[in-house]
Amino acid sequence: MHSSGGFQKAIHGHALLLLLLLASGAETFRICAFNAQRLTLAKVAREPVLDTLVKILARCDIMVLQEVVDSSDTAIPLLLRELNRFGDSGPYASHSSLLLGRSTYKEKYVYLYRSHEAEVRDSYMYDDQDDLFTREPFVCWFSLRSKVLPSLVLVPLHTTPKAVETELNALYDVFLDASGRWQTKDVILLGDFNADCTSLTKKRLDDLVLRTQAGFHWAIADGVDTTVRASTHCTYDRIVLHGELLQSLLRGAAAFDFPQSFGLTEQEALNISDHYPVEVDLALSWAVHGVQPPCLATLWLSLLLPLLAPQLGLVA
């Protein structure tokens, strides 16, 4: 029979083992959005810019790029090629919208995603019959290697600063359209919403349908700075989650301060973008490997039973 001290040490050791077991399943699935500020082939071809972009992208399982203005369709293939050469982060694939906009200036939405973790199940350009959006959302339904969350829908939007309120209220209709089309509640709205500072006052922000309607969680909270310049402090870029299951899997949300992480000066960072990427982490790792997360009580019992059996006289 264990002595009291020995038993306590054994309990302590098994508790540590339990934590290690739980931690081994604690890797997360990261979804990001990044306004890459007028991304062209000329910009991507600059080595310092390309290197930094690759390091930013390699942190994400799914990335939605905005302000891709490359009409030659060569910038993303170059970026994708270098991303797939970077360490063991890949393989990545891409899925792009058409060029969008009302004038000669047009942008694309581009999804970059780890193809062994996610795949595009379906996608469509929102039918903006009332022409409320300057760049209508390019909605994408992803299948995930997860039994916890087999699929989710992403709805990106880069608003125009002069019509932020109109576009963000119309984004609720896009949510309803996508949710109804694919019969899912697990939807993420994300992108450069311009949802702060002079583009959208706090009062107007709080009156948005996406703020007053129940069921939406603004993961990138008000007050988080998503801008690179030291002279600005605005929460322009947002990620909004809908769906109880999806929200229950949220483990973190942040703006990624890439200048600080990569040791860049402000000017060096501005060569990349004047925005930080924003990101959410979802706890899908057990399911990514095809295994459901074990119940905490089950883990405790499996670890403690060998210790408790002698104490309870259960040993034959």
Swiss-Prot record:
Protein's name in the database: Deoxyribonuclease-1-like 1
Enzyme class: hydrolase
Pfam families for this protein: Exo_endo_phos (PF03372)
Glycosylation sites recorded in the entry for this protein: 271
Superkingdom of this protein's organism: Eukaryota
Signal peptide: 1-28
Cystines in this chain: 197-234
Lineage of producing organism: Eukaryota, Metazoa, Chordata, Craniata, Vertebrata
GO biological process: DNA catabolic process
Matches recorded under InterPro entries: Deoxyribonuclease-1_AS, DNase_I, Endo/exonu/phosph_ase_sf, Endo/exonuclease/phosphatase
Transmembrane parts of this sequence: none
The entry's keywords: Disulfide bond, Endonuclease, Endoplasmic reticulum, Glycoprotein, Hydrolase, Nuclease, Signal
PANTHER family: DEOXYRIBONUCLEASE, DEOXYRIBONUCLEASE-1-LIKE 1
Claim: Endoplasmic reticulum is one of the keywords in the record: yes
Gene Ontology MF term list: deoxyribonuclease I activity; DNA binding
GO cellular component: endoplasmic reticulum; nucleus
Primary location group: endoplasmic reticulum
The keyword Glycoprotein belongs to this UniProt entry's keyword annotation: yes
